[in-house]
């Protein structure tokens, strides 16, 4: 099976993820459970070939240098996928997270009305939190979609990688992918303040500098959206404070 056939099987079975790992058969995650596909185990050379075929030269160089890399990948008429490629003790590995081909709306998600109320706040920092697979990116995409359809402004996103692709409607949308359109979150956020955005989406608050820049953007008249990998809203505040040096925490 080639990668397109494996991904088609994954999508057909409504899997959230396709796992490729040297030494074992391909597996899919369905309803939270990881299940084997009824095909022979793949060796390192096979997995390596499958993932190399869909990577750009830059992605290949990153993988060879850092032993892991992230990127997005689309198959026309099927879906988009967020891909993480890595090495493990048996050889190459990769995980393909399925991204819906259409952006779900807040109504599709049955989101409470507070989500629309947050969007109407002119400035501030809106954080969507939760563990991996909890729907953070899907929720943010729905919020961006609502703004795009109902407001007039400039939406700037910085993502690693771009997951949901938005088409400008009432808003101008510029989506920047880390390592393709910018060197990093920090560089993109510094530049963002000179790009006249009304709304800024940061794919993930990963480190102190990114958090500082997101807070600065919120304090200087922008509505900033971001995700944080925490299990609750209360723990999110603690997580952000803990990132700062001891001397700055009381501030």
PLM regions and their residue ranges:
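Short, flexible helix-loop junctions that flank or precede catalytic/ligand sites
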Residues: 1-251
